[in-house]
């Protein structure tokens, strides 16, 4: 009965080996030929104690090859020589505790054929791994080939180094001499770089300080050039428009009048003198206009630049705040304001507007005003500017102090006109409220004195602010025609 069971068991094992024989041929061939790309250097070191109790350390270098039945990494430890038959007694004696955290060395001597499976390389590697060894050194390679068999189970996780015949003999003699002297032999395994210039190690960019600096500068240069291109593309239309408007402003400067400033000795002499060229043009335009085209006073012009009653124009430039000297050349803008050419020319070329009234010298118009719907909500500002329908009627009351300041100059002018030439209420034309002029710059100077008033005269689409002194000079052609025709 036992014989029958033994025969059945052997038959099953043989059939299993036959089924798995063909897939494992490749493993057997690789293990037998030992053609592996990775090799290892084995440094064997032992300390000799001389007679004078001095220590002498001796190190030899051996060359081996990583076996496919184990892993391939660098390690080290003390060397322990183990018999090749110790793995066969694993069931009876158990694991070998002497190789724990050491490197066992197994020398294959003449091994009988019936013991081939017991002393095979994969069995030795698994036994050393289970015993806690750091690595396994076997040799010679010619005898290891005869003990190989198809690997039925996965390989070991510790490095397995196979030595050739010459290296095995050197290691054997070194261990023998160290054993005679009673020295502990240590072993260290490291990789061998057979090809110093491997293709895999060729690097296009080496991370050196110079290369990193050059790369950073190149990136900064690329970003800077990209930003320049983007800014140029985005600002190109604006630049063309600015150049075009600047050329138009330069053309407008060539068409503006330049006059010499002259101071008058007294007011009476100035009244008898010939009016300035600006008011001469105003008088000529008024004489050519219709009877109903009257120059109505705009109360918003009361906030214009204050002028002294004893002078015919501004005494100083509002830009540089320098007083005008006799014979100084002044540039007269289309709106009537005067400045030093050196002060106002750069401003007009860049801004194209009068610094005082914001009159556009290129398009020749004032800034756009708000719509009537928006102006209806500003009753506190426009109510004080509404004209009177009759001489006896006062201006509408307003909470602001500005309306009080505006009514008194009007009354002063009203009393200055003789009663004989004072118009009746039914002849006075109806005054339409004008929208306040929007100005981007704040009010620069305080209101003029009470006995002064400015008339905003609109001629040919242009507007000019005239001081009371000019009004006194031009009263002969301003007030009298009104009394005879419309007033």
UniProtKB/Swiss-Prot annotation:
GO terms for cellular component: axon; early endosome; Golgi apparatus; late endosome; perikaryon; plasma membrane. It is an enzyme of class 2 (transferase). Pathway: Protein modification; protein ubiquitination. Keywords: Cell membrane, Cell projection, Endosome, Glycoprotein, Membrane, Metal-binding, Signal, Transferase, Transmembrane, Transmembrane helix, Ubl conjugation, Ubl conjugation pathway, Wnt signaling pathway, Zinc, Zinc-finger. Residues 232-487 are cytoplasmic. Its main location: membrane. Glycans are attached at residue 10. GO terms for molecular function: ubiquitin protein ligase activity; ubiquitin-protein transferase activity; zinc ion binding. Expressed in a subset of head, ventral nerve cord and tail neurons, the excretory canal and tail epidermis. The chain crosses the membrane at residues 211-231. Residues 1-21 form the signal peptide. Its EC number is 2.3.2.-. Disruption phenotype: Mutants exhibit cell migration and axon guidance defects in HSN, AVK, CAN and AVG neurons, and also display excretory canal elongation defects with premature termination of the canal. Double knockout with either unc-53 or vab-8 results in premature termination of the AVG axon and AVG polarity defects. Residues 370-487 are annotated as: Disordered. A zinc finger (RING-type) spans 317-358. Belongs to the ZNRF3 family. Probable E3 ubiquitin-protein ligase that acts as a negative regulator of the Wnt signaling pathway by mediating the ubiquitination, endocytosis and subsequent degradation of Wnt receptor complex components Frizzled. Acts on both canonical and non-canonical Wnt signaling pathway. Plays a role in the migration and axon guidance of different neuronal cell types including CAN, HSN, AVK and AVG. This is Probable E3 ubiquitin-protein ligase plr-1. It comes from Caenorhabditis elegans. The lineage of its organism: Eukaryota, Metazoa, Ecdysozoa, Nematoda, Chromadorea.
